């Protein structure tokens, strides 16, 4: 009770104290509230930033794993494509190698035998060398024969000239022009004239024409009834010496053929002949005798005439692809022809049919 009475006595002052105490505490409360708000905002900021950092770290890890997964997947696709590309390139290279080997074998065996052609060319080269050597020897022999013939011709010409100029030979009384007394020794032509004989001109034989009349066949009038004697040479007649011309030249000059003038040599119908010759040349130069007409409807009804080469039942030979034709149906056995170099028929005749310097070898 005493306490209650004491508290009731103080109740008037408690309100004032409470008011003053609260009025003094309000600024501290506001300050503490602001401090608490600042601390709380700073703490929440740190908490949020830590959480954001955590989220960033987690997102980075997730992105790293995801991107690594996508990278590995893309890398696997790239490796797979590269593997398939490498395998296709390898397959293509192997196929090309097989095709190259097979085509080379096929060409060498069936189309173009390189070793056969090489051996053939080697034999042809050796044969050509042998023939060229033989031809060179033959040419040298011909050249020697030609030189010998030229020397003989020159010798005969000098002999004929010496016989023709035999009248210039020196005598006991008069020296010749080649034996001048002012020279120490005579000219070589003087010795040539001494060795030569004087040239004698033979008279041309007169050919007697045999008549074919009936009277000539009689025994009394026939030329074959009595033997005829040849013309005898003149008796005690000296040979004329002097610079006379050859009888053949004189006869050629005397009986030379007629040389007509241009007016006489040309024919009268020269213009007509020239026109015929020109027409003949134009006809020879003409490629097609048919008249050229447009291609619209003129050649529409013409029947195509195939060439003889295409209309034949035999197929054309593929040149430059094979050296001989193969027909397995005509083979006696299953073996193919042996690739042995055949003999040359032309070269085998060498030394048997050719002549060397007019003598059969």
Swiss-Prot record:
Location (main, coarse): cytoplasm
Subcellular location: Cytoplasm
Location of the IQ domain: 32-61, 55-84, 91-120
CC annotations in GO: cytoplasm; spindle pole
Record keywords: Calmodulin-binding, Cytoplasm, Repeat
Molecular functions (GO terms): calmodulin binding
GO BP of this protein: establishment of meiotic spindle localization; mitotic cell cycle; spindle organization
PANTHER family noted in UniProt: ASSEMBLY FACTOR FOR SPINDLE MICROTUBULES
Name recorded for this polypeptide: Spermatogenesis-associated protein 17
Organism for this UniProt entry: Macaca fascicularis
Lineage, broadest ranks: Eukaryota, Metazoa, Chordata, Craniata, Vertebrata
Gene designation per UniProt: SPATA17
């Amino acid at each position: 009770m005493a306490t209650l009475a004491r508290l009731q006595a103080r109740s008037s002052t408690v309100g004032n104290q409470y008011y003053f105490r609260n009025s003094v505490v309000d600024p501290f409360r506001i300050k503490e509230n602001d401090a608490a708000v600042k601390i709380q905002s700073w703490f929440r900021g740190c908490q949020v930033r830590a959480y954001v950092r955590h989220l960033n770290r987690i997102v980075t890890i997730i992105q790293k794993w995801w991107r690594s997964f996508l990278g590995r997947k893309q890398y696997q696709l790239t490796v797979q494509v590269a593997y398939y590309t490498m395998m296709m390139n390898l397959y293509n290279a192997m196929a090309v190698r097989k095709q190259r080997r097979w085509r080379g074998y096929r060409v060498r065996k069936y189309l173009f035998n390189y070793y056969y052609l090489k051996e053939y060319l080697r034999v042809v080269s050796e044969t050509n060398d042998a023939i060229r050597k033989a031809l060179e020897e033959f040419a040298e022999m011909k050249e020697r024969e030609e030189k010998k013939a030229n020397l003989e011709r020159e010798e005969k010409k000098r002999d004929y000239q010496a016989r023709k100029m035999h009248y210039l030979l020196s005598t006991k009384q008069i020296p010749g022009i080649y034996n001048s007394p002012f020279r120490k020794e005579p000219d070589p032509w003087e010795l040539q004239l001494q060795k030569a004989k004087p040239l004698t001109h033979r008279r041309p034989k007169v050919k007697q024409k045999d008549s074919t009349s009936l009277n000539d066949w009689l025994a009394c009038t026939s030329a074959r009834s009595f033997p005829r004697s040849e013309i005898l040479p003149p008796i005690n007649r000296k040979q004329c010496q002097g610079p006379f011309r050859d009888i053949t030249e004189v006869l050629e000059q005397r009986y030379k053929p007629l040389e007509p003038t241009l007016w006489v040599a040309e024919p009268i119908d020269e213009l007509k002949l020239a026109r015929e010759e020109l027409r003949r040349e134009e006809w020879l130069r003409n490629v097609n005798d048919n008249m050229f007409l447009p291609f619209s409807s003129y050649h529409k009804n013409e029947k195509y005439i195939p060439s003889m080469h295409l209309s034949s039942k035999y197929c054309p030979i593929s040149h430059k692809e094979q050296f001989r034709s193969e027909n397995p149906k005509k083979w006696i056995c299953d073996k193919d022809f042996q690739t042995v170099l055949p003999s040359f028929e032309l070269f085998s005749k060498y030394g048997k049919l050719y002549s060397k310097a007019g003598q059969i070898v």
